[in-house]
Amino acid sequence: MTVQWQVSDAELDQFAAKVADGGEVADGMRQRAKRAFRLGMIVYEDAIIGTAALKKPAASYRTKVFKKAGSQLDPAAYPYELGWIFLDVPHRKKGQMTRLIDDLLPAAKGANLFATTRTSNDIMRGMLAQIKFSEEGTEYQSDQNPAETVKLFVRNAHQTEASE
């Protein structure tokens, strides 16, 4: 497992392709991955089999997400987003993704974080709960797949410190 700030072009291509495998990609994924604060990758036999990222999204994006979720929280208080989380099916349920995320989170230096996931993604919802994220607001329609709904999760720095 690696957490990187800078990646090669080949790694960036593999990262973007793996995120696309998870069905979470929109146009411009490679460029957005290039701008991410930190990229995390799980590599097996020289291939990326899992991805996660710590992002510092624009204020306008954070405001849009929190508004869609009907959240009363201040989006400015959540500067980091945990996202682009995907792991190939044969490698799931082995704790690898939790370890990768545990390696990524210290880069946020204790700041509040948010994440979104499809409401139907029970595995991701469970993992977010396991790493001390809580559901916030109401589910809302996915921009990428109108047949799906999305749920906002937040992790507050003071709650994390109190529970550790």
Model-based region annotation:
Residues 50-84, 142-146:
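Conserved acyl-donor/pantetheine-binding loop and adjacent beta-alpha core of acyl/acetyltransferases
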Residues 119-142:
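Conserved active-site alpha-helix within GNAT-family acetyltransferase domains
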Residues 141-164:
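C-terminal "cap" of GNAT-fold acetyltransferases
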Residues 108-119:
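Conserved GNAT acetyl-CoA-binding A-motif
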Residues 1-31, 39-49:
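Short amphipathic alpha-helix that is part of the acyltransferase structural core
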